[in-house]
Regions:
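Detector for Asparagine
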Residues: 8, 21-24, 40, 85, ...
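Short beta-strand elements at the ligand-binding edges of bilobed clamshell
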Residues: 27-39
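Hinge/cleft segment of the Venus flytrap/periplasmic-binding protein
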Residues: 48-124
Length: 124
């Protein structure tokens, strides 16, 4: 038996902070989204590839050596390959984006621009 009475508030969330999700947040149709900057994902990928090509040991120390200015965690337990081997991963910490922090989280860093109506558009 459900306790849903039809008048409960349903939270709608999203991932990736794409333009449609952000418009829904501005319009009050969606509560939040999580965002990871593609540029930061590219930086991690490039630094990881450079370290591998140099023959460096790939571990958590890459985070400190690289001097990234964003949060990243090294995870050796959560993911496995199809044959069951652990797959160490560098995971960017996502930013929770709501109507209250659109400007601070996405516009101020230069990821998005905001038009006169308050809607966000990719900066590049």
């Amino acid at each position: 038996e459900s306790d849903y009475a039809g008048d409960n508030t349903v939270l709608i969330t999203g991932q990736d902070g794409d333009e449609a999700n952000l418009a829904n947040i501005v319009d009050g149709k969606q509560s939040m989204t999580v965002y990871k900057a593609v540029a930061n994902e590219a930086v991690v990928t490039l630094d990881l590839a450079k370290a591998m090509l140099a023959g460096d040991t790939i571990d958590e120390s890459l985070i400190e050596k690289s001097g990234w200015d964003f949060e990243c965690a090294y995870d050796t337990e959560s993911y496995e390959t199809s044959d069951g081997n652990k797959c160490p991963s560098f995971l960017l910490v996502p930013t929770v984006v709501t109507k209250d922090n659109l400007q601070e989280a996405l516009v101020d860093p230069g990821y998005y621009t905001m038009d006169d109506d308050g809607y966000l558009h990719p900066a590049n």
